[in-house]
Amino acid sequence: MRPAGRSVQQVRPVTITRHFTRHAEGSVLIAFGDTRVLCTASVEEGVPRFLKGQGQGWITAEYGMLPRATHTRNPREAAKGKQGGRTLEIQRLIARSLRAAVDLTKLGEYTITLDCDVIQADGGTRTASITGACVALADALSSMQKKGQLKTNPMKGFVAAISVGIVAGEAVCDLEYVEDSAAETDMNVVMMEDGRMIEVQGTAEGEPFSQQELNTLLELARGGIDSLVQAQKAALVGA
């Protein structure tokens, strides 16, 4: 039996709290069960040098964990003087995923930075970051419209992400830490709301997985992402 008695396809309770901080154009606290991530979207005029003069915008991301987001304290990466490989991988994933949600040619020469800070980690921090950052991004784009910085909203659709895996021989959706640490196969899936895939990261930690198991995992991911998109849209009602 899974922790908390969840079924194989059941995601953890998800809450999305908008306008969590005052200053950012978009700000969301998202919870996937006991995993909590603060996601902010900040708008700045200008784009990276390689895009100057092209009339299009850019979306980038930064990711980090508070020192005591985990069971034992991890020193801040700033104190070490450099970011770790995992951090760099995750923030690039977040940025790639959210760029897929926006028509950058309609953004104008603005850069939106998505900052995802893990307050508490219990598995799925990158998937929670992407899902929460999408809502923060939606709020930032709405803010830009209200300020007259955008004529139309360039958002093409919602993006969400979920983890799936094989634990004790069974395919399950939305792994928490105890499941993730024991998984034979671990996979993160990022999708548009219409089911088109943005990224699939899958690794066999133990036994290799079959094509049939891969299909089962992707079906579980689609169901989980559908429920996350519903939560995103519900959070934005009345935006």
UniProtKB/Swiss-Prot annotation:
GO terms for biological process: rRNA catabolic process; rRNA processing; tRNA processing. The gene is rph. Coiled coil: none annotated. The keyword S-adenosyl-L-methionine does not apply. Belongs to the RNase PH family. This is Ribonuclease PH. Keywords: Nucleotidyltransferase, RNA-binding, rRNA processing, Transferase, tRNA processing, tRNA-binding. It comes from the Bacteria. CDD domains: RNase_PH_bact. InterPro entries: ExoRNase_PH_dom1, ExoRNase_PH_dom2, ExoRNase_PH_dom2_sf, PNPase/RNase_PH_dom_sf, Ribosomal_Su5_D2-typ_SF, RNase_PH, RNase_PH_bac-type, RNase_PH_CS. It comes from Sodalis glossinidius (strain morsitans). Signal peptide: none annotated. Phosphate binds at R86, G124, T125, R126. Its EC number is 2.7.7.56. It catalyses: tRNA(n+1) + phosphate = tRNA(n) + a ribonucleoside 5'-diphosphate. Disulfide bonds: none annotated. Phosphorolytic 3'-5' exoribonuclease that plays an important role in tRNA 3'-end maturation. Removes nucleotide residues following the 3'-CCA terminus of tRNAs; can also add nucleotides to the ends of RNA molecules by using nucleoside diphosphates as substrates, but this may not be physiologically important. Probably plays a role in initiation of 16S rRNA degradation (leading to ribosome degradation) during starvation.
